[in-house]
């Protein structure tokens, strides 16, 4: 089968990083297509907390004001051990922009990103199965037999990235923990307030977060169990057992959660040392989002850093494409290829150490918060709980910049 007409940029995966990259390119006047294997946008994970770095990325993409209308701003955190005993510690946020945190349903965020793209940008039911070299181009083979030809290939296809494997990445490593997530809806409103409640200890870390007046997102991470992820009734009972010492208003959130909204998945991450020598970009191919830096959710930076990726990648590609247009239509193909390659190398260089930092910090925070050891527990509960909460905010103090330096 012959390839369809040549595309400038193909992005694989319509998740946060893929859509952010496509929207960034669109804002710069550069067309791309996004290949999504599912029949519609996927919203795995239910909700995510958006920190300072995410807001800077969304400002660059032109969607920040709309997203602000979708979630209440946090007033602060309440942190305490999951077992009865020590009193809770509270951290109130200043009103400055560095401390703006909101929890937004993932589907609403994806819809907002996709809604800003030109019609036809996203091609659903388009599963990548093979990548083939063709001179300075890449031939993208889909499961239905379609072949697409592209000048740039961007892998935003998640933890099991086909593009990542082509670049030489190994599969992410499973931790000894699983995450159980859910979302509760209250027709007459909930009483959680606008604070992020966190509980930890005894091998457990859990959180309860208001998205809006009627919706609460919650999660619980725990050492791996033999629970069947399809048996939602047993999963719900398991979580209720783990939070039995928490206040009644917290337990009522779980009791209100519909069984259909429960999901359980193993936590995975990319060993940070792999990024020291890995090819984040090679030739005219690169990866972003979970395809680049899968991490545990302990500092809430998976989705936020994916938006950073999208803005920075769009800027680097935009600089390369704009330079091409300035030289005119007769530009040598080799020169165009070299400039795109240099742009992707620039992107890779800017994301390597940021990714290593976030992966390492997230894994370490999760290890400390879920520790069962006597001395580690004492040290954490007495001295570390406030510091770990502060660290979550500190790691979000990153500004990806604007889409264009002009």
UniProtKB/Swiss-Prot annotation:
Cofactor(s) recorded for this entry are: FAD
Q: Name one GO molecular function term.
A: monooxygenase activity
State the EC number(s): 1.14.13.-
**What start and end residues bound the annotated signal peptide?**
none
Write out the tissue specificity statement of the associated record: Expressed in seeds, seedlings, roots, leaves, flowers, pollen and siliques.
Gene behind this chain?
MO3
Fetch the InterPro entries from UniProt. FAD-bd (IPR002938), FAD/NAD-bd_sf (IPR036188), MOase (IPR044560)
This protein's name:
Monooxygenase 3
* SUPFAM superfamilies referenced in this protein's UniProt entry, alphabetically: FAD/NAD(P)-binding domain (SSF51905)
């Amino acid at each position: 089968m012959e390839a369809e007409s040549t595309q400038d940029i193909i992005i694989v995966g319509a998740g946060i990083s893929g859509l952010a990259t496509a929207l960034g390119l669109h804002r710069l006047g550069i067309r791309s297509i996004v290949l999504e294997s599912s029949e519609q946008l996927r919203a795995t994970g239910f909700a995510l907390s958006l920190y300072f770095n995410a807001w800077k990325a969304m400002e660059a993409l032109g969607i920040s004001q709309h997203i602000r209308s979708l979630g209440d701003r946090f007033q602060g955190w309440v942190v305490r051990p999951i077992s009865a005993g020590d009193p809770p510690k509270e951290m109130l946020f200043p009103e400055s922009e560095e401390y703006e945190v909101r929890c937004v349903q993932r589907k609403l965020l994806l819809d907002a990103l996709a809604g800003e793209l030109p019609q036809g940008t996203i091609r659903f039911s388009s599963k990548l199965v093979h990548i083939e070299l063709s001179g300075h181009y890449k031939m993208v083979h889909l499961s239905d037999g379609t072949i697409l030809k592209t000048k740039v290939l961007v892998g935003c296809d998640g933890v099991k990235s086909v593009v990542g494997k082509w670049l030489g990445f190994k599969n992410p490593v499973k931790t000894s923990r699983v995450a159980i997530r859910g979302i509760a809806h209250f027709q007459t409103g909930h009483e959680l307030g606008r604070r992020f409640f966190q509980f930890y200890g005894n091998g457990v870390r859990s959180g309860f977060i208001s998205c809006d007046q009627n919706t609460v997102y919650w999660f619980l991470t725990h050492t791996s169990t033999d629970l069947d992820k399809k048996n939602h009734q047993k999963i719900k009972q398991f979580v209720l057992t783990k939070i039995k010492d928490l206040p009644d208003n917290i337990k009522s959130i779980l009791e209100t959660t519909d069984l259909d909204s429960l999901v359980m998945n193993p936590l995975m991450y990319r060993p940070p040392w792999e990024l020291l020598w890995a090819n984040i970009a090679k030739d005219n191919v690169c990866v972003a989002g979970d395809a680049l830096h899968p991490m545990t959710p302990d500092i809430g930076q998976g989705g936020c850093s994916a938006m950073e990726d999208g803005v920075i990648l769009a800027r680097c590609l935009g600089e390369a494409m704009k330079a091409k247009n300035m030289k005119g239509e007769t530009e040598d193909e080799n020169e165009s290829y070299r400039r795109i390659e240099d742009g992707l190398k620039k992107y890779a260089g800017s994301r390597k150490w940021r990714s290593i930092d976030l992966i390492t910090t997230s894994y370490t925070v999760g290890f400390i918060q879920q520790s069962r050891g006597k001395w580690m527990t004492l040290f954490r509960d007495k001295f570390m709980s406030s510091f770990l909460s502060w660290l979550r905010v500190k790691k979000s103090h990153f500004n990806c910049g604007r889409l264009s330096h002009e």
